[in-house]
Amino acid sequence: MQSQRERPREDRVHEETRGADHAHPSVPHAAAAASATATETATRTMSLHAGGVVVVDGKEKGKKEEGEGKRKGKAPATAEAVRGRARLRGEQLRQLHEIFLRFDLDGDGSLTKLELAALLRSLGLRPAAGDEIHALIAAIDADGNGTVEFDELASSLADLILGPCRPSVAVDQAELAEAFRAFDRDGNGFISAAELARSMARMGHPICYAELTDMMREADTDGDGLISFEEFTAIMAKSALDFLGLAAL
């Protein structure tokens, strides 16, 4: 049997993405677990807006001592990347670093195309087309070595979600529709407070009345007491920022 180190990197990325979905929501502003089914992703996001989010396991997988895992001849972080990293507050930087380590499976301090795509999926995002991940890496990869280091990710992630690169990243509408139907138990096109509470409990995330009230207030932007698909989509689209605590940047 092949060891973890011997197995192909791509196989381990897929396995890591599949297996990281069993954490329980608890600590506010913690990192999202790796991507799973659309309904589970939606449940995590709705739980976030109740004041708790899914926590990636506490182990900083792949972490090495300072100086280890550096590629020979690897370019130092650019001044722009260092400035971008400085924009993040300490807790934000810690959370982002946990996510980075989770997907840097061989611990070499950088993300490949496949690892970056898996990280984006863990935040509820996906490349709009397969070849556009190359454009995302090019936009983030300040030193041009073909991979993404942590300083580059810290510098670029807010712009990736909010700025000029946004057309390259999209919330998966088909998966959102599937998740919405799981909450909309009577199929009338809206999620009521009762449906939301029952769905959260059924999916293993029971919520109290105060949490339910907060969730409805956050999602129900028109104040009609129901969550429409458009409102559901909006709350999901902002989840990546909230997971990382970047919304205030």
From Swiss-Prot:
One of its GO terms (molecular function) is calcium ion binding. PROSITE patterns: EF_HAND_1, EF_HAND_2. Ca(2+) 3 binds at residues 184, 186, 188, 195. InterPro entries: Ca-binding_regulatory, EF-hand-dom_pair, EF_Hand_1_Ca_BS, EF_hand_dom. The keyword Calcium applies. Residues 30-56 have a biased composition (Low complexity). Pfam families: EF-hand_7. Ca(2+) 1 binds at residues 104, 106, 108, 110, 115. Ca(2+) 4 binds at residues 220, 222, 224, 231. Residues 1-80 are annotated as: Disordered. The keyword Metal-binding applies. It comes from the Eukaryota. Potential calcium sensor. This is Probable calcium-binding protein CML12. It comes from Oryza sativa subsp. japonica (Rice).
